[in-house]
Amino acid sequence: MSAAPREDGRADDELRPITITRHWLDHAAGSVLVEFGRTRVLCAASAAEGVPRWRKGSGLGWVTAEYAMLPASTNTRSDRESVKGRIGGRTHEISRLIGRSLRAIIDYKALGENTIQLDCDVLQADGGTRTAAITGAYVALADAVEHLRSTGALTGEPLTGSVAAVSVGIIDGVPRLDLPYVEDVRAETDMNVVMTGSGKFVEVQGTAEGAAFDRAELDALLALAEKGCADLTRLQQEALSR
């Protein structure tokens, strides 16, 4: 089935322009500004010796994450959740997703009793904020691990691989990769896929928004996501090599 060309002129299997800028902040152990087209997320990693109380004495480390959106990151200003006095369900969900995704490639024993906290703040949202956050957070995490190593806090290699994420969806019957907001809001099927650099799936979140999808469409979406995550993995490694 044919569909109207994408507004930004991309092919259906093409990522938006991706930029990964390291060392964005002076004080964080690792920091990255990641850009998926017009979506921009600042990912900062703080590293500290010690672990949460329930983890003490285990010899195991911990990695966790928090996600938030700046009030002016969308076209309509939203109040800060800290001012509201409670964290919304969507924010909790995405924070936990980022944490799970990063922990999938962590060797807790090699990390030792150290904690790495990732803070992912959306500066501008144009679809795919959670997948951009995961992709950028991995690079910040890798830099934080090197920071801990430079201070003598660890000697092993806690990273067992890399992790990246991308959105896919069906628009007018056609599977597409890396949806901006204008596509996301009218997608018949919307999916977020998290994968390791070795090609294994960490998480697949898929929802039929307008019409149910069949197995062939699911397979097509996963194939697109595999391609997208492989491209993102390459960009992550290029960023870390600079």
UniProtKB/Swiss-Prot annotation:
GO BP annotation list: rRNA catabolic process; rRNA processing; tRNA processing
Catalytic activity: tRNA(n+1) + phosphate = tRNA(n) + a ribonucleoside 5'-diphosphate
InterPro entries the record matches: ExoRNase_PH_dom1, ExoRNase_PH_dom2, ExoRNase_PH_dom2_sf, PNPase/RNase_PH_dom_sf, Ribosomal_Su5_D2-typ_SF, RNase_PH, RNase_PH_bac-type, RNase_PH_CS
Binding site for phosphate: 90, 128-130
Keywords recorded for this protein, A-Z: Nucleotidyltransferase, RNA-binding, rRNA processing, Transferase, tRNA processing, tRNA-binding
Classification via PROSITE patterns: RIBONUCLEASE_PH
Top enzyme category: transferase
Alphabetized GO MF terms: 3'-5'-RNA exonuclease activity; tRNA binding; tRNA nucleotidyltransferase activity
Protein EC: 2.7.7.56
PANTHER family according to UniProt: EXOSOME COMPLEX COMPONENT, EXOSOME COMPLEX COMPONENT RRP41
Record family assignment: Belongs to the RNase PH family.
Complex and partners: Homohexameric ring arranged as a trimer of dimers.
Function: Phosphorolytic 3'-5' exoribonuclease that plays an important role in tRNA 3'-end maturation. Removes nucleotide residues following the 3'-CCA terminus of tRNAs; can also add nucleotides to the ends of RNA molecules by using nucleoside diphosphates as substrates, but this may not be physiologically important. Probably plays a role in initiation of 16S rRNA degradation (leading to ribosome degradation) during starvation.
Annotated protein name in UniProt: Ribonuclease PH
Organism whose genome encodes this protein: Nocardioides sp. (strain ATCC BAA-499 / JS614)
